Amino acid sequence: MSMLIFNIRVARHKALLSRIVSTNMFNPMFRSLRPIQKSFSEISILRVFNKPPIKKFHNSNILKDITSKRNATPAKIAWQAMTTREPFLVYQAKADKKISLIYLLTVGMLINVCVITSFASVDIYRAKDEIFANWVDMDYYEKLSYIGSAFITPALYFTLTLILFLPRRNIYSISTLPSQRFEIVTGFLSPFNKLYFSKSLIVPRKDVSIVTYSLQKNPITLKIRDRPFYYLLNANGKYAGNSKDVLFCVIGNRY
């Protein structure tokens, strides 16, 4: 019954508005008031169903928001990053194909040299009786080759371990978290934009500092308190607001 009454009211409003439009169609004053009459009709019909009028958004507001974000200073972006309640991405590394290919090539060569040196060391160990028996009769270069192989083998394995350790100190992304914290993701970014050896660290903001005195240097060096060694950050990555100064505003520097 109530629905029928609502329908009757809507029909009456529509009939009244159509009568006003038909009688005042050729009145110039009424033509200027037609947008007002149209908005009044929408509001009156919506009030019948106890619904609020629909707000209309203009593209000008959207353009203002976009231009305000583009014109935002690093200090404003840093303030937004430190006051947000959600993770805010400040930096993300780009895939540098040259560095990645050189890194992979170096690792492959070291593995190959380590394998060859290991087999050579095994042969020397098996023939040690003959070698040491003739040690006095060997010349200087032969002795130097045996001594050098004894030092090169552990040095190669140490170098390989160091190269595999570097991705743990290579920063992939930095994000701000609530309660004045950072989420630092480390890893090796391949030429195909795949992250290997990734690890996530959540540390307080006060424990992170930039050691590099200039952002024009590459890589940028970061230090985390109570953690050994330094962390490296590729300066050619993506920054919030497309400005490197955001790092100094968010992290800060300590020489």
From Swiss-Prot:
Q: How does it sit in the membrane?
A: Multi-pass membrane protein
Give one Pfam hit by family name.
TMEM70
Subcellular location field: Mitochondrion membrane
Q: Does the keyword Transmembrane apply?
A: yes
Q: Which domain of life is it from?
A: Eukaryota
Chief subcellular site? Answer: mitochondrion
Q: Which UniProt keywords apply?
A: Membrane, Mitochondrion, Transmembrane, Transmembrane helix
What's a single GO CC term here?
A: mitochondrion
- Protein name per the record: Uncharacterized membrane protein P22H7.04
Which residue ranges run through the membrane? 99-119, 146-166
Q: Which organism is it from?
A: Schizosaccharomyces pombe (strain 972 / ATCC 24843) (Fission yeast)
